[in-house]
Amino acid sequence: MSGQSLGSAPIFCAHLLRRVDEKLVDLLGSLEPSEWDLQTLAPLWKVRDVAAHLLDTVLRKLSMVRDSCYVEAVTIRSPQDVIALVNRLNAEGVTVYRRLSPPVLIDMMKAACQQSASFHESLDPFAPATFAVSWAGEETSSNWFDTARELTERWHHQQQIRLATNRPGIMTPDLYHPVLDCFARGLPHVYRDVDAPVGTVLLLEISGECGGQWFLSRESTRWNFLGRSAREFACRVTIPQELAWRVFTKGIDRDSARAQIAIEGNRDLGERVLHLTAIVG
């Protein structure tokens, strides 16, 4: 587990997208025909559906963000509109690409992922991203955050396939820790309506070699990250690293998660962590 307080510094992880997606291509190539129909944590998706989603989203992002190709005009008036749009596009993409044979899908995935990695590596990390990270409450995000968000998407869906097929391999400090750090960036937004005395400190600790510590402090008008705190924390929430990604991506219900985490101090304050959902939909 990282000994540093996290949450403030940019996450530079463009180089990791290539590695994660190379592992995805290798994983898909290793599957037996029957394994493509195994159920994943996503209730409506089997392995082939998750693979189809990963192909759809990488092609969609290259088309829209890199190539500025928008074939459908949409009007977004609320966060609910964003969720509805994303859910519709995801469902449409899976419907199309789940029809592909594994060899065809894998070949397309390999080519698309190579282009995606090169694209993200070429971006100015501090320039404005085309799409903001909405689950963190942002209306404008820097490219580094959008790239980190992309890493969380690629990592957690691949992990769904690995869990379904009993093929571990990406829960390593170099690949998983940046994912956790990106997830945690949503904490100030999750706590935005939680009132507490100024100076109240919450500690989120993810245990295990891939984890870390995030200190969240109540300021006059908002919650914000701070460096390693000498102040006494009002609450410490400890989540095992094996569970954390599922908590933050709707991979486990809150009641089941609540039974597997440890909360020291103010329990009401700590349980709010379980409301962090680092995906759209």
Model-derived segments and spans:
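Short, helix-capping/interhelical loops that line the mouth of catalytic, cofactor-
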Residues: 1-12, 60-115
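An N-terminal domain-cap segment
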Residues: 2-49, 63
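Acidic interhelical loop/turn segments
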Residues: 29-40, 114-146
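Short, contiguous alpha-helical
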Residues: 37-81, 133-192
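Acidic/histidine-rich alpha-helical segments that form the ligand environment
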Residues: 84-127, 144-150, 200-202, 233-235
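A glycine-rich beta-turn/hairpin centered on an aromatic-Pro dipeptide
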Residues: 176-218
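Acidic/His-leaning functional-site neighborhoods
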Residues: 207-236
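C-terminal interaction segments
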Residues: 229-281
